[in-house]
Amino acid sequence: MKYSIDDLIFSKDIDEDLYCQLCCNLMNESVSCPNGHCLCKGCFHKQIETVKSECPICCIPVTIQTLCKNIYLQKHINNLKVYCPNSFLNNDNNKLILDEKKGCKEILTIEQLKNGKHLKECKFTFVSCEYNEKCGKYRMNEIENHQDQCNYYPTKCFYCKNDFERMNLSNHLLLDCPLVIIGCRYKDGGCNETFPRHELSKHLALEDNHQQYISNIINGHQSLLKSTSKQLKQLRSSCEELETKLINNDYSFNGRWIIKQFSAHFDLFKENPFTNLIISPPIFLTPTKEFSLSLSADTVVNSVNCISVILSKQFQSSSTIKFSFEITNQSQTKSIKKEEKKKFSHLIGSSHSIEFPTSEIYNIHNKFIVNDQLIIKFNIKILSIQDEQQEIEESEENFNNTLITELEE
């Protein structure tokens, strides 16, 4: 903590004559010229050695040898009251902040502060943790409380008697200590023996490799897996039932897709339409019903170049979905909105699109692209979901029929 005597002054009503006219601080070891003008000893010496050998106040010629100590003035200064430096918070700022709750309450004279006796005995001095500097600094009267909780405090293992940092002792006992009493790793299979950790290998060798216990554990895991699978199936069924109820209650999603730096995205897309697709962040209607939007600029419909806004379904069940896209214009009355209702297959990635004429969107006078960003408002509403397993079975059956027909031909 950095401070000057001026920072610690208890009373602010101090005679201006006690301040040095060069450094503007309280005079430290005041000395005077033959005419009686006083400055700090250090300031007067610096004036003579680096500026000019004269008093900066009356301009009388002086040398270091002709300067006189002003004992009376210095005694008056030394009797001024100051705070103990440990009255303040230990902060990294240049400004001292009085710590009224935990700081030292002692008021000293400047002379008492300079002789250092109080500072050597003060219980409010800041000290570093002796076990690790990362802990920071604490007042001397609080350091014991810190050490009772310090993660780096050396703690002796009850079993092996070695010292460990407090934060590492638990792991030592749990994983490493050779003298800790442990149970057999095949306890779940029926082996209830206990022994010091360092005898584990010996125990395993004497028990015919614990084959029967291992078999018991495997059987237990298989039984648990079967039970867990049954519970998971029930949870999935409940989840699907809840989602169906949500959808039947007009569950839908409204949002906006803002494509910033649109021109840069579009240039990358033109370089490689397959790897540089413009794709939205994921959209979740429910925790398991995910969608995404993407933009394609190379679609041709009836000989007209179009921008396609594509809705992709990222979950595995057939769905009938009503969706709309609105490419917004700076003038709301000129925004273009289109709507579709489509059936999406059970496959993940099943998609449908809506097209918008490129010439209208890219015409700068039409003001669809403003500040190099394109905004697309969208609405997605799931109207119905077909049973997932039924849809997959129907799909597999149709696929097998197609293969058979091709083989017959």
UniProtKB/Swiss-Prot annotation:
This protein's UniProt keywords: Coiled coil, Cytoplasm, Metal-binding, Repeat, Zinc, Zinc-finger
KW DNA damage (keyword) present: no
GO molecular function: zinc ion binding
Superkingdom of the source species: Eukaryota
Similarity comment text for this entry: Belongs to the TNF receptor-associated factor family. A subfamily.
Primary location recorded for the protein, binned into one broad class: cytoplasm
Domain named MATH: residues: 252-380
GO-annotated cellular components: cytoplasm
Gene3D superfamilies: Apoptosis, Tumor Necrosis Factor Receptor Associated Protein 2, Chain A, Zinc/RING finger domain, C3HC4 (zinc finger)
ZnF (TRAF-type) ranges: 75-145, 145-201
Domain comment, as recorded: The MATH/TRAF domain binds to receptor cytoplasmic domains.
UniProt feature coiled coil, ranges: 221-250
A Pfam family recorded for this sequence: zf-TRAF
Subcellular location: Cytoplasm
Source organism (scientific name): Dictyostelium discoideum (Social amoeba)
Protein name per UniProt: TNF receptor-associated factor family protein DDB_G0273435/DDB_G0273505
Summary of the function given for this chain in its UniProt record: Probable adapter protein and signal transducer that links members of the tumor necrosis factor receptor family to different signaling pathways by association with the receptor cytoplasmic domain and kinases.
InterPro entries per UniProt: TRAF-like (IPR008974), Znf_RING (IPR001841), Znf_RING/FYVE/PHD (IPR013083), Znf_TRAF (IPR001293)
Leader sequence segment: none
